[in-house]
């Protein structure tokens, strides 16, 4: 897909809409792009926090390929150096839905590796710890305990909102 070009005023207007709607955090999704500086400037100016994903989403990644791992580390270093002085960046997140999809497909089978796990557990948190140690790193979203889409810990993606598949909240509903 092609990303359109938006002038800084457009970023400011959209962030202002989020602020005026009483939002306090926006997520830069791992299946998208690292946003333009105008986005982060607007968030800084308007007090909006940013949940910043690294650009890994809904896929397997060849963490057994050392050249690929080195490229990921270089990209992460550039991104963290670029954004670490921004007041708006609240946390770094390793990926979007990769652990959860692995859980869904492989039902926790230890014989089936999650390609990319090394990136989320070693490479990316290592870069963040070295270059931006005051901010938290979260391995993925959703992520929590042994069930990456747990209702009891971590963060959760609720896929039951589609096509009226909402689960009951309590017995009898």
Where are each of the predicted segments found?
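Active-site groove signature of glycoside hydrolases
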Residues: 78-113
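Extracellular glycoside hydrolase catalytic/binding regions
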Residues: 108-111, 115-173
């Amino acid at each position: 897909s092609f990303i359109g070009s938006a002038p800084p005023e457009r970023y400011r207007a959209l962030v202002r809409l989020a602020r005026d709607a009483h939002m306090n955090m926006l997520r830069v999704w791992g299946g998208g792009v690292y946003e333009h500086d105008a986005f982060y400037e607007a968030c800084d100016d308007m007090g909006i926090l940013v949940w910043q994903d690294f650009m890994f989403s809904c896929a397997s990644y060849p963490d057994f390929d050392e050249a690929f791992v080195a490229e990921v580390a270089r990209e992460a270093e550039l991104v963290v150096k670029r954004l670490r002085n921004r007041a708006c960046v609240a946390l770094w997140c390793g990926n979007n839905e990769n652990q959860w999809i692995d859980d869904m497909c492989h039902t926790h089978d230890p014989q089936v590796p999650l390609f990319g796990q090394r990136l989320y557990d070693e490479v990316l948190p290592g870069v963040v710890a070295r270059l931006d140690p005051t901010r938290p790193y979260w391995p993925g979203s959703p992520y929590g305990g042994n069930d990456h889409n747990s209702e009891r810990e971590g963060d959760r993606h609720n896929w039951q909102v589609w096509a009226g598949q909402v689960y009951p909240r309590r017995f009898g509903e």
